């Protein structure tokens, strides 16, 4: 089924094919919040799924917008919403986010999204991130799966490709680590990367 179609992701959710969902906030992101490395701001969570990470950042005072292609995922985000922890939920193709959101966000958060996108659209994805972030904004990615596998999804991800795509657009790599907090089944197959958009071009 076409990864560019909401039907593919809807079917995965409806039939238990959502193995990317950890069922809780990502430990690596939780550690970021606990160590105070980032300051609260406006955050877009792409391919947000059931919203575990989006809710965790909202709970820590971030103004969160969470977007997912799947109607089921958006419904789950609404169902699991925590009173007093507001966040905006958008059910739509992230490539169709309106230009009214251009340069709106201090952060874009990504996990198991880049690997789900048709590799032919990766340039388009990075252009989208560039468009949505404020000058000086930060793209936070837990890049996964770092592998040479053929086919997908999940499609293989390489740090070298991410470095090339973001640095071509003037982004600066400000953080790179292989986190010890990764869940055991993904340890060694993911890296935390942060790229900062230039303030001026």
Describe these PLM feature segments.
Residues 109:
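A conserved beta-strand element that flanks and buttresses the S-adenosyl-L-methionine
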